[in-house]
Amino acid sequence: MNKIIPISLLFLLTACNNAESLDVNRLIPALSKVESNNNSLATGDNGRAFGKLQIWQLVIDDVNKITGSKYKHSDAFNPVKANEICKIYLSYYCTEKRLGHKPTMEDGARIWNGGPNGYKKDSTISYWNKVKAELK
């Protein structure tokens, strides 16, 4: 009986800690598939979201402020630049210091979908489920 409790506790801790660590290079293709079916020329959200990652001007503004770069909204149509923009955005907002825990794939997807605090918003859960399905 004494061994059952520690083994049960170990199983519980492992089950609770199965969230996958953030790997932006693996996450971006899944985001792209969900956002636009990998269409680099896509325009969505009534003309406000551009490219395969459906990047808004607000994201461009944040990235330029963070890095001092001069991305234009039209750069979102360039797949290489779109990836750079996404990586910069997530590397700034999806950090252990900011979130209070090690960033996960879920955090990254939900921040991409819902903004800097998207990881807390119920409205981003269904988006995460779509991204998670693409990651499998």
List where the protein language model places each region.
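Short, solvent-exposed loop/turn and secondary-structure capping segments
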Residues: 42-44, 122-124
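Post-signal-peptide N-terminal segment of Sec-exported extracytoplasmic proteins
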Residues: 43-54
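Alpha-helical segment that forms one wall of the substrate-binding/catalytic cleft
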Residues: 57-119, 128-136
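Sec-dependent signal peptide recognition
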Residues: 2-9
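Short, functionally critical alpha-helical segments immediately adjacent to catalytic or ligand/cofactor-binding
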Residues: 23-39, 55, 86, 107-116
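Signal peptide cleavage region of secreted peptide precursors
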Residues: 18-21
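A short, acidic/glycine-rich surface segment
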Residues: 39-42, 96-97
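C-terminal motif of bacterial Sec signal peptides marking the signal peptidase cleavage site
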Residues: 14-15
